[in-house]
Amino acid sequence: MPSFDVVSELDKHEVTNAVDNAIKELDRRYDLKGKGTFEFKELTVTLTAEADFQLEAMIEILKLALVKRKIDAKCLEIKDAYASGKLMKQEVILREGIDKELAKKIVAHIKEAKLKVQAAIQGEQVRVTGKKRDDLQEAIAALRAYDSGMPLQFNNFRD
């Protein structure tokens, strides 16, 4: 029976490259030169700046760098800014994997579409199986049109 997996993964090397590009862009910007920093540790980027508006500009720089590296900005979870001495800090978490709640929503969306496929949750991925390849392609089209709040990839397509 043909099947495929719905996953949400990040290429960690591309994320590292995107953060490095954001750091370089921060050094090039005249209005932000020497006023802010990016720190990247295990899918968490900590932004440090002197003012709130600088943090917002830094978030836009980070989003642009990620998009240039073909990483969807939907995976960003932006926390609230907080004061740390004279500086403002903000954490941006890069989300990866499909949690149980999102997996249930994906399965429900596939069932609502009334396609001739079955969806099953398997850890951090959703396996979709069907009798025909065309049914699976319809399921992929339905999931691409669905706004899940996370970037979804489709892999492990088997006949």
Curated annotation (Swiss-Prot):
Lineage: Bacteria, Pseudomonadati, Pseudomonadota, Gammaproteobacteria, Pseudomonadales
Keywords, alphabetical: Nucleotide-binding
PANTHER family assigned to the protein according to its UniProt record, in alphabetical order: UPF0234 PROTEIN YAJQ (PTHR30476:SF0)
Similarity section: Belongs to the YajQ family.
Protein's job: Nucleotide-binding protein.
CDD domains linked to this entry: YajQ_like
Pfam families: DUF520
GO terms for cellular component: cytosol
Molecular function as annotated in GO: nucleotide binding
Protein name: Nucleotide-binding protein Psyr_4087
UniProt cross-references to NCBIfam families, sorted A to Z: PRK05412.1
Keyword match Nucleotide-binding: yes
